[in-house]
């Protein structure tokens, strides 16, 4: 367990290295460049890919398996190697798990098994302390990090799990998308569904349908405002899915979800962290979300908070700094930027105590 002062220093250095608006050149001059290597990971579908970022020297390092969700810009989005290098320079061995399904803009419950296998691969890497390994995920990858942390094969060996901008329940997320409504205890507000959210939604909802009907629905509902394709000739299961691709009044979403095919609803549960939180054994669970996130509404993380509040080791933070985990898209006044960055250091700090 790292001392509090040392952990605070590492967390601060990590934030300076991660955030593009902050000067990181001094850190780069004072420490050798991290090492990056591509690895092949075990997968239910055969072989998966991962990227390992490690400090240039030293052993006995904590490890973190990263699930970064759907990245439209692909594997070389500039923030991804920046994150890996920042973690490595701060002392972690970081393994980025690349999900073939998420690269195809789909959610697949098999990713939970594959992420758990990636975690075990991380624990066996040279220079890694297997007792100080955890998981971290962003966006839908954050939800899968929570699901993997509850996986029976690894849950007793996960030292921490952290997330940023996850969803809590596929069902509530589907209801929000279908109704174009953000729902919270304070009331309901209209929501303009982000194009990325919509693309993943349509591809995930149609994934188990017959290929010809799947392709028809994907083509007919390419954007949230697409003109609906004809329902003629669709089977009962495809019609049930199609109903939720059209705008549905919020009060009708429960009925519409209940009418989905059994296999679709089974997959919903397998991919919903709220259904698996009791399986998490990690002593540290960290959740963060931007209040104005347009891709996954903050209400999803608030549902996690409601279930986890009071649990020892649980930390929750809301930010006004990011645009869906991306710190480059907002311009804040200097004093507000300073406050938000300080908040982010405090959010990250517990992870550096491991």
What are these regions (language model features)?
Residues 75-83, 96-134, 144, 149-152:
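Catalytic nucleophile-loop/oxyanion-hole region of alpha/beta-hydrolase
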Residues 56-87, 98-99:
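Short, surface-exposed "cap/lid" segments of acyl-processing enzymes
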Residues 175, 233-269, 302-306, 310-354:
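C-terminal catalytic histidine-bearing segment of alpha/beta-hydrolase fold enzymes
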Residues 147-237:
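Alpha/beta-hydrolase-fold enzymes
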Residues 9-59:
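N-terminal cap/lid segment of alpha/beta-hydrolase-fold proteins
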Residues 280, 286-289, 293:
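Short beta-strand/loop motif that positions the catalytic acidic residue
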Residues 133-142, 290:
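Conserved alpha/beta-hydrolase "nucleophile elbow" surrounding the catalytic nucleophile
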Residues 269-284:
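Conserved serine/cysteine hydrolase catalytic core
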């Amino acid at each position: 367990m790292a001392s509090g002062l040392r952990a605070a220093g590492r967390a601060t250095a990590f934030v300076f290295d991660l955030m593009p608006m902050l000067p990181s050149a001094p850190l780069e001059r004072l420490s050798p460049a991290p090492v990056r290597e591509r690895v092949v990971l075990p997968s239910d579908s055969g072989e998966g890919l991962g990227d390992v970022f490690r400090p240039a020297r030293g052993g006995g390092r904590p490890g973190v398996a990263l699930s970064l969700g759907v990245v439209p810009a692909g594997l070389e989005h500039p923030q991804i190697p920046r994150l890996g290098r920042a973690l490595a320079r701060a002392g972690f061995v970081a393994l980025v798990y690349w999900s073939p399904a998420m690269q195809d803009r789909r959610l697949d419950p098999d990713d939970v098994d594959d992420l758990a296998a990636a975690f075990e691969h991380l624990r066996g890497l040279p220079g890694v302390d297997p007792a100080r390994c955890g998981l971290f995920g962003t966006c839908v990858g954050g939800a899968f990090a929570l699901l993997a942390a509850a996986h029976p094969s690894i849950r007793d060996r996960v030292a921490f799990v952290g997330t940023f901008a996850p969803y809590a329940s596929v069902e509530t997320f589907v209801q929000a998308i279908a109704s174009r409504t953000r729902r919270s205890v304070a009331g309901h507000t209209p929501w303009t569904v982000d194009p990325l959210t919509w693309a993943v939604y349509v591809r995930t909802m149609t994934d188990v349908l017959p290929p010809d009907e799947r392709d028809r629905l994907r083509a007919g509902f390419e954007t949230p405002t697409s003109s609906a394709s004809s329902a003629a000739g669709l089977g009962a299961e495809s019609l049930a899915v199609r109903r939720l691709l059209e705008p549905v009044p919020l009060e009708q979403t429960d009925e519409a979800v209940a009418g989905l095919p059994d296999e679709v609803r089974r997959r919903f549960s397998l991919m919903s962290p709220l259904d698996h939180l009791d399986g998490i054994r990690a002593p540290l669970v960290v959740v963060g979300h931007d209040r104005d996130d347009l891709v996954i509404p903050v209400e999803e993380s608030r549902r996690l908070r409601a279930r986890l509040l009071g649990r020892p080791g649980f930390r929750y933070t809301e930010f006004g700094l990011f645009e869906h985990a991306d710190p480059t898209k907002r311009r804040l006044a200097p004093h507000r930027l300073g406050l938000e960055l300080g908040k982010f250091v405090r959010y990250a700090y517990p992870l550096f105590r491991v």
